[in-house]
A protein has these predicted regions:
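Kelch-like beta-propeller repeat domains
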Residues: 1-172
Length: 172
């Protein structure tokens, strides 16, 4: 299939998709990336083409319609697909996914602070009886509730589907 780098908004009043014209260079076309918003800024991370996985982070200012590639510090996550990115205050949490070319599954929770532009890793602790990190996965969903990251489903390294809901304790 083909990858694109165009941007569309869904208008909640008209219930229609609208193309968004931008006034800057857009990220390279890709699929399998994730996006989330903090205030008036949308962030995208990762994704791939048929040849490459990306570990770049971009921001789109909704008010000015401008894309910017973010120059970061710290150890950024490897390029990946099938991951999630979830906003928790000024932090973006990247979890799971796999490198497209090697099928390497990542076992770390990565945190990006939108104020300092710095990546760090966060210890993974679950509320499950066995404790420790949740099983490696791709294609899952996450959301934040009451300061915890809720993780649902996905696909394991061995190809089996997961139907669990795991609470990840976010330790500062």
């Amino acid at each position: 299939g083909r990858c694109f780098n165009d941007l569309h908004w869904f208008d909640l009043k008209s219930l229609r998709w609208q193309p968004q014209l931008t006034t800057s260079k857009s990220p390279m076309q890709r699929s399998g990336h994730c996006a989330c918003a903090v205030d008036d800024t949308m962030y995208i991370f990762g994704g791939n083409t048929t040849k490459n996985s990306f570990n770049d982070l971009w921001e789109f200012d909704v008010l000015s319609s401008v894309w910017r590639q973010i120059k970061t510090t710290g150890k950024s996550p490897s390029g990946r697909v099938g991951h999630t990115i979830t906003a928790l205050g000024p932090r973006l949490l990247v979890l799971g996914g796999r490198e497209y070319a090697t099928n390497y599954f990542d076992c770390h929770l990565h945190s990006f602070d939108v104020r300092t532009r710095h990546w760090s890793q966060v210890p993974l602790h679950t509320s499950s009886p066995r404790g420790g990190p949740p099983p490696l996965r791709t294609g899952h969903c996450t959301t934040v509730h009451a300061g915890r990251l809720l993780l649902f489903g996905g696909l394991r390294e061995d190809g089996r589907f997961l139907d669990d809901i795991t609470t990840v304790e976010l330790i500062s």
